[in-house]
């Protein structure tokens, strides 16, 4: 059987028998075919057909920046210079305003400069201290241990305060009370015929006396009348608002709105 198969098999070509005649495929063609199989097809603008395009990835360039490293000594010196510079700028920008007066020496008033005829003029001391405190209200300043304020108003005697503030006010009140009392006594004497001495034992006259004293204390100036009027309006304001909330609108105003 094997002999018959060998007889009917076609003859082997001489070119296949000779190994030198086998065509060699170049590596360049193999490499292009290999890339063509994995490449992405791109449409041609001429006939609409797709043609393989080989895209070769490019290496990405990485830029490395070198950061200079400072030594601890340089960093500490830089921080100190920055702190000194900041303090310099702060000191240059801050403007300190302090109270200055020729009579204000070492945190107190020099009482020798307030002497008149060998005696201290306490009225001038009170006025100067009032002006200094008013200036401090408008221009506050910080205190320090180097410049202590040792002045105290307790060094001013009590009679100086009374002479400065109480006596002028008391003179006004006493004068007004005397005028009002004399007018009321004359009015009672003209109506009833009771004299001034007899009025001191009368209950009605004593009541008028207390009314006069209270009026003099509460109404010292003409501006006090406006203050009392404002207080009276304020006490009755909420009552007026409450009554206005419950008041019905007039029929004339409602018809005009319609």
Curated annotation (Swiss-Prot):
Give the membrane topology: Multi-pass membrane protein
Question: Where's it mainly located?
Answer: plastid
Where it sits in the cell: the answer is:
Plastid, Chloroplast thylakoid membrane
What keywords are annotated for this sequence in UniProt?
Chlorophyll, Chloroplast, Chromophore, Membrane, Photosynthesis, Photosystem II, Plastid, Thylakoid, Transit peptide, Transmembrane, Transmembrane helix
Tissue specificity annotation: Expressed in photosynthetically active tissues (at protein level).
Q: What is the effect of changing residue 189 to A?
A: Decreases interaction with GGR
Q: Which GO terms describe its biological process?
A: photosynthesis; positive regulation of chlorophyll biosynthetic process; positive regulation of phytol biosynthetic process; positive regulation of vitamin E biosynthetic process
- Report the record's disulfide bonds: none
Membrane spanning stretches: 177-197, 199-219
Q: What happens when the gene is disrupted?
A: No visible phenotype under normal growth conditions, but the double mutant plants lli3:1 and lli3:2 are dwarf with yellowish green leaves.
Q: Which residues form a coiled coil?
A: none
Extent of the transit peptide: 1-42
Query: Record's GO cellular component, any one?
Result: thylakoid light-harvesting complex
Mutating residue 174 to A has which effect?
A: Decreases interaction with GGR
Region ranges (Disordered): 66-92
Q: Does the keyword Plastid apply?
A: yes
The listed outcome for residue 171 to A is: Decreases interaction with GGR
One annotated GO molecular function: protein-membrane adaptor activity
What the record says about the induction of its expression is:
Down-regulated by light.
Please give the function described in this protein's UniProt entry. Answer: Light-harvesting-like protein required for biosynthesis of phytylated chlorophylls and alpha-tocopherol in green seedlings. Functions by anchoring geranylgeranyl reductase (GGR) in the thylakoid membrane, leading to the stabilization of GGR activity. Binds chlorophyll a in the thylakoid membrane. Plays a role in the regulation of chlorophyll biosynthesis under light stress and under standard growth conditions.
- What is its quaternary makeup? Interacts with GGR. Forms homodimer and heterodimer with LIL3.1.
For this entry, the protein name equals Light-harvesting complex-like protein 3 isotype 2, chloroplastic
């Amino acid at each position: 059987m094997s002999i018959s198969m060998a007889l009917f098999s076609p003859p082997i070509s001489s070119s296949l028998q000779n190994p030198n005649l086998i065509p060699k495929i170049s590596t360049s063609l193999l490499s292009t075919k290999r890339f063509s199989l994995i490449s992405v097809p791109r449409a041609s603008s001429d006939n609409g057909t797709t043609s393989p395009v080989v895209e070769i990835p490019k290496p990405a360039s990485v830029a490395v920046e070198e950061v200079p490293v400072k030594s601890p000594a340089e960093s500490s010196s830089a921080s100190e210079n920055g702190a000194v510079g900041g303090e310099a700028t702060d000191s240059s920008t801050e403007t300190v305003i302090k109270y200055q007066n020729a009579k204000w020496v070492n945190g107190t008033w020099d009482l020798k400069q307030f002497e008149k005829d060998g005696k201290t003029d306490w009225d001038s001391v009170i006025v100067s201290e009032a002006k200094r405190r008013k200036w401090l209200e408008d221009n506050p300043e910080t205190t320090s241990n180097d410049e202590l304020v040792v002045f105290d108003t307790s060094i001013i005697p009590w009679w100086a305060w009374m002479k400065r503030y109480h006596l002028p006010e008391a003179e006004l009140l006493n004068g007004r009370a005397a005028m009002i009392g004399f007018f009321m006594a004359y009015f009672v004497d003209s109506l009833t015929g009771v004299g001034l001495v007899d009025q001191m034992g009368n209950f009605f006259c004593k009541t008028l006396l207390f009314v006069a004293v209270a009026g003099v204390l509460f109404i010292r100036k003409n501006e006090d009348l406006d203050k009392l009027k404002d207080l009276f309006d304020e006490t009755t304001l909420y009552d007026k608002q409450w009554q206005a909330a419950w008041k019905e609108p007039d029929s004339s105003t409602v018809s005009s709105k319609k």
